Amino acid sequence: MCGILAVLGCVDNSQAKRSRIIELSRRLRHRGPDWSGLHCYEDCYLAHERLAIVDPTSGDQPLYNEDKTIAVTVNGEIYNHKALRENLKSHQFRTGSDCEVIAHLYEEHGEEFVDMLDGMFAFVLLDTRDKSFIAARDAIGITPLYIGWGLDGSVWFASEMKALSDDCEQFMCFPPGHIYSSKQGGLRRWYNPPWFSEVVPSTPYDPLVVRNTFEKAVIKRLMTDVPFGVLLSGGLDSSLVASVALRHLEKSEAACQWGSKLHTFCIGLKGSPDLKAGREVADYLGTRHHELHFTVQDGIDAIEEVIYHVETYDVTTIRASTPMFLMSRKIKSLGVKMVLSGEGSDEIFGGYLYFHKAPNKKEFHEETCRKIKALHQYDCLRANKSTSAWGVEARVPFLDKEFINVAMSIDPEWKMIRPDLGRIEKWVLRNAFDDEKNPYLPKHILYRQKEQFSDGVGYSWIDGLKDHANKHVSETMLMNASFVFPDNTPLTKEAYYYRTIFEKFFPKSAARATVPGGPSVACSTAKAVEWDAAWSQNLDPSGRAALGVHVSAYGEDKTEDSRPEKLQKLAEKTPAIV
């Protein structure tokens, strides 16, 4: 990941303005510590802080077309850049950067080229021939981008809010799958997949199509000129990413440079579920595994930094971002600059434990659509900013455009959790990789119950956060929360504590409006809380709030014969239909 900042039409091309742009861009340097670039044309500025992943020697930005009339600053990876270059043979490329194709595609197709890009990206392009500009963000919002407006009529774009929040009174998250055009005067959606309408699909489930499409998604993301690894918690999603990556690593260009030994990383409190499961999967796959330990106090000490970098006060995001933030620092110290991660699967397949209570396939499917549309405010935000805080790039194969289209076209009846048929959450994905002849994973890992990252690193992590917040937020403070924070009022002491820290860094009303709100249980949307009347009394984003579902649910007996464990064993015995 890199950091980008663009200021366009600011009616000021003075040296003081240039210095201010450099100062603001420096706030993003953690995202791209390898090099800095700045393009100035009259009163337009494109700044770039580079994390060199592809073509480290010559791919510095901003990037240009042949005569430099088109300049572009990009944060992202374009996985199909070689195929796109094949159709641009009349153009002269200056670098081997995957992002340079953007300038030349614009020359060929004007603004209608964004859908050709297969990757994660946020970019701003300036056409100096008529001083027009466009900005665009990838389909799901894997890559962060904000848009703001200066009092002088200027338009601002930045990878993180901290680069524009002081100079813009009005700003917001740039919506995923959209393009901003100065010629057309606003935003429009470029990404319009069939599932976006939330109409219930009817395509029969084909496990081999699911498997093959996911494998292609992982292979694409092995495009790198620097050392990389996989974040391996031992859960289904990260384990599948690691397993598939390992199978194809030997054939990749990355193996020629860095060897075919896959590095995997896991973090947790001492004795946590993730450490145990991650070690077991790493041993099974034969990876070079790195276990990182932290204490509750280590996490608490990092909370302020986490909120500053991740730019949110959402409880579940902060809980999960903190261990990921700590792990990323260690990963960077080992010389690794890119990691593969398992975000997105739970949204696509209904993997969160509250999906057990989905009343029918229509509501199940609509909830998965809502979850995917909101990913840029939650898991994408966490995965990107927690790692980018230390100059590490996270790639997410489950959020591949083609894979999402395949998975979201499946009749949701197949995704429904059916104890009577031995189908636990994400059975569609588990079954697709249940290969008896050439196993991807051990059965008990393939059918391990979902653990949210903030739970899996150790249950005492969340309990410790709550205890810490209770010491800093009194009952009186919480009772008066609606007066202190009338917008998106915190409902718990933990939420209040995070909000006070956030407001210290980002005091403007526009900043707090970038953070989502509303009731949630076990990471549900507000709409899904209606599925179980009991949930309204236990609004906690932890998976343990899914009473009657999680094997370690709050206030429930943790016995060996609990119903979810029985269901897991039944699922392991259910014959695969691959």
From Swiss-Prot:
Pathway(s) this gene product operates in, as recorded in its UniProt entry: Amino-acid biosynthesis; L-asparagine biosynthesis
Domain of life the protein comes from: Eukaryota
Alphabetized UniProt keyword annotations: Amino-acid biosynthesis, Asparagine biosynthesis, ATP-binding, Glutamine amidotransferase, Ligase, Nucleotide-binding
Molecular function via GO: asparagine synthase (glutamine-hydrolyzing) activity; ATP binding
Record flagged with keyword Cell inner membrane: no
Active site: C2 (for gatase activity)
Site feature (Important for beta-aspartyl-AMP intermediate formation) residues: E343
Catalytic function, reaction form: L-aspartate + L-glutamine + ATP + H2O = L-asparagine + L-glutamate + AMP + diphosphate + H(+)
Documented EC number(s): 6.3.5.4
Basic and acidic residues bias spans: 555-572
Residues binding L-glutamine: R50, L51, A52, I53, V54, N75, G76, E77, D98
Record CDD domains: Asn_synthase_B_C, AsnB
Stretches assigned to the Glutamine amidotransferase type-2 domain: 2-185
Asparagine synthetase domain span: 210-450
Enzyme class: ligase
Residue numbers binding ATP: L231, I267, S341, G342
Residue numbers spanned by region Disordered: 555-578
Record flagged with keyword ATP-binding: yes
Gene3D superfamilies per UniProt: Glutamine Phosphoribosylpyrophosphate, subunit 1, domain 1 (3.60.20.10), HUPs (3.40.50.620)
GO BP terms, alphabetized: L-asparagine biosynthetic process
Pfam families: Asn_synthase, GATase_7
Function: Essential for nitrogen assimilation, distribution and remobilization within the plant via the phloem.
NCBIfam families: asn_synth_AEB, PRK09431.1
Name of the featured protein: Asparagine synthetase [glutamine-hydrolyzing] 3
Organism: Arabidopsis thaliana
GN (gene name): ASN3
